[in-house]
């Protein structure tokens, strides 16, 4: 387990993100929607996406504190399809405030892909074990059955009715001891794509 996460000061709300996976999905959405809508799609607004995930996870307006943990491969210095994007210089240790409260960002590099697969579920285990955490939003690589099943197993062992846990994926997945939300909606909002614009082109 990465020492950086072991020493983390947890917040009442936590968003745990496989950042490499979300970046890849965002690239696919940009390519597909540029073709469909016939216009350039700008990089996704990271703060807007985080807000949308928080809302989908049940957070409402107020003076909340939310920790956003971006897990990424060590050889990836930045998100390619979001702004701001540089893990070390623009994201790690930074924060922003809006109507949903304060969001604290922690970017955690992982050495190898195999380590990353298990690291994500280990990070999730650590998060669900924290008594002070009331709300957890999880964005794993749900397209990988191994990773998704590890996430499900971890969450199905959580014996805390006070925790509201939401897992985000691009399509509905086998359920468990958690709520589910579709990841694509928050990413579309962050990319400035509305359902009305899609309807007008179909």
Model features per residue range: what roles?
Residues 2-108:
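Domain-level signal for Mg2+-assisted phosphodiester chemistry and nucleotide/NA-binding surfaces
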Residues 97-202:
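Nuclease catalytic cores that cleave nucleic-acid phosphodiester bonds
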